[in-house]
């Protein structure tokens, strides 16, 4: 009986991993964000490494806007299978 439970658990883990992998492929993040559209992710004086540790983008080339900001999430359309 224990082996059947182990197989069920393994199958559920495998299905969950595949589902999460598909979701991860469907979205990608980019640090290409217009300065006026940046959403603050840091605090005054945040360093590039502190910002990166939060999973955010750092760009201090534009004054008056957040330097540590959330990346844009872009939906990537799934690849279509070609039928020959």
Curated annotation (Swiss-Prot):
P-type domain span: 29-72
Annotated signal sequence range: 1-24
Outcome of mutating residue 32 to K: In a gastric carcinoma sample; somatic mutation
UniProt-reported outcome of changing residue 55 to V: In a gastric carcinoma sample; somatic mutation
Any one GO CC term of the record: extracellular space
Disulfide bond found in the keyword field: yes
Keywords, comma-separated and alphabetical: Disulfide bond, Growth factor, Secreted, Signal
Disulphides: 31-57, 41-56, 51-68
Major localisation: secreted
GO MF annotation list: growth factor activity
Tissue specificity note: Found in stomach, with highest levels in the upper gastric mucosal cells (at protein level). Detected in goblet cells of the small and large intestine and rectum, small submucosal glands in the esophagus, mucous acini of the sublingual gland, submucosal glands of the trachea, and epithelial cells lining the exocrine pancreatic ducts but not in the remainder of the pancreas (at protein level).
Entries under Pfam families matching the protein: Trefoil
Record GO biological process: carbohydrate metabolic process; cell differentiation; cell population proliferation; maintenance of gastrointestinal epithelium; negative regulation of cell population proliferation; response to immobilization stress; response to iron ion; response to peptide hormone
Locations listed in the record: Secreted
Keyword set includes Metal-binding: no
InterPro entries with a match to the protein in the record: P_trefoil_chordata (IPR017994), P_trefoil_CS (IPR017957), P_trefoil_dom (IPR000519), P_trefoil_dom_sf (IPR044913)
Quaternary structure annotation from Swiss-Prot or TrEMBL: Heterodimer with GKN2; disulfide linked.
Matching PANTHER family: INTESTINAL TREFOIL FACTOR-RELATED (PTHR13826), TREFOIL FACTOR 1 (PTHR13826:SF18)
Main function: Stabilizer of the mucous gel overlying the gastrointestinal mucosa that provides a physical barrier against various noxious agents. May inhibit the growth of calcium oxalate crystals in urine.
Protein name, entry field: Trefoil factor 1
Gene name of this polypeptide: TFF1
């Amino acid at each position: 009986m224990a082996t059947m439970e182990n197989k069920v658990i393994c199958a559920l883990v495998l299905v969950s991993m595949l589902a999460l992998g598909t979701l991860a492929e469907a979205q990608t993040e980019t640090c290409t964000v217009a300065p006026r559209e940046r959403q603050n992710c840091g605090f005054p004086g945040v360093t590039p490494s502190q910002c990166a540790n939060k999973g955010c983008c750092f760009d201090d080339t534009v004054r008056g806007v957040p330097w540590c900001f959330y990346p844009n999430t872009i939906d990537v359309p799934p690849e279509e299978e070609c039928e020959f």
